[in-house]
Amino acid sequence: MAQLPPKIPNMTQHWPDFSSQKLSPFSTPTATAVATATTTVQNPSWVDEFLDFSASRRGNHRRSISDSIAFLEAPTVSIEDHQFDRFDDEQFMSMFTDDDNLHSNPSHINNKNNNVGPTGSSSNTSTPSNSFNDDNKELPPSDHNMNNNINNNYNDEVQSQCKMEPEDGTASNNNSGDSSGNRILDPKRVKRILANRQSAQRSRVRKLQYISELERSVTSLQAEVSVLSPRVAFLDHQRLLLNVDNSALKQRIAALSQDKLFKDAHQEALKREIERLRQVYNQQSLTNVENANHLSATGAGATPAVDIKSSVETEQLLNVS
């Protein structure tokens, strides 16, 4: 029994390109398939299975909090996902409930396809169920067995793609997005961009921390300067006073040294005078002795007394000096 493929929520932006790639070999326009439509109407359990599978896929592919990659196109995808869900729940169900009019009014199918087309194009997405239903309607009844085989292969292929989607779904999205004109980011490129942003943010944080540390050091140094500047000024004043005292002491030392030189010269002069007076005294004593001897020889007694008195006076003068 023919079954339509399940929905893949994460590939909503690439259904036009996906349908053109997967269904192009066997989507040749032919007569409407009445038998396929009647079998689809007679199987209402397929709809429940489709809804359960779509709900489970939507629950499995939600991005968790721990994911480190956040795509920049997430708001647009979320809006398109809501529109795609509303199309599946309301219009897609109404399309299958109206398939009982295929025998009576074949033109009604074209009208319904025309009505469903703008709704899908409003969100820039086309469901695989709609395109596959159109292909089933266009195939002749003679190709019913081949259609069933193609449906089974298509379901297996879609399910395998759904299983492989968490691992390499982004690469297939990039390949199909380039052909359909939609721009999808590569996860490696996203990681590289995020790493660059994080490194830039860390560098900015380090620069800000370094600047704040420099500002704190500058403020601390300014506070120390403001505290030590009065003490430095006081020490400068004391140094000036000490320099003045030092200069005065130097001048006094110079004066004292000059006085010492004068005193030394005066002492030398006095010593020379003492030597001269001693020599004079010795000469006078010798002359007096000679005179005394001469007088003693002549017999004059008064003159020796005078000579003795003069010699005593000279000795006193020498002792005083």
From Swiss-Prot:
**Which domain of life does this protein belong to?**
Eukaryota
The bZIP domain extends over 186-238
Q: Which UniProt keywords apply?
A: Activator, DNA-binding, Nucleus, Transcription, Transcription regulation
Leucine-zipper, as annotated region: 214-235
Positions of the UniProt region annotated as Basic motif: 188-207
What did gene disruption experiments reveal?
Answer: Pollen morphological defects, reduced pollen germination efficiency and pollen tube growth.
Q: Where in this protein does the record put region Disordered?
A: 97-189
Give me the stretches of Low complexity compositional bias.
110-133, 145-155, 172-182
Q: What is its main location?
A: nucleus
Q: Name one GO biological process term.
A: positive regulation of DNA-templated transcription
The protein's matches in Pfam families, at most eight in alphabetical order, are given as:
bZIP_2
What's one GO-annotated cellular component? nucleus
Q: In which tissues is it expressed?
A: Expressed in vascular tissues of leaves, stems and siliques, anthers, filaments, tapetum, mature pollen grains, pistil vascular tissues and papillar cells, and funiculi.
> Could you tell me which PROSITE patterns the record lists for this protein?
BZIP, BZIP_BASIC
Localization per record? Nucleus
- UniProt entry tagged with the keyword Zinc: no
Task: Read off the InterPro entries from this record.
Answer: bZIP, bZIP_RF2, bZIP_sf, bZIP_transcription_regulators
Heme: is it a keyword of this entry?
no
Quaternary structure annotation from Swiss-Prot or TrEMBL: Forms heterodimers with BZIP18, BZIP43 and VIP1/BZIP51.
Function recorded in the entry: Transcriptional activator involved in the sporophytic control of cell wall patterning and gametophytic control of pollen development. May play a role in the control of metabolic pathways regulating cellular transport and lipid metabolism.
Which protein, by its recorded name, is this? Basic leucine zipper 34
Q: Which organism is it from?
A: Arabidopsis thaliana (Mouse-ear cress)
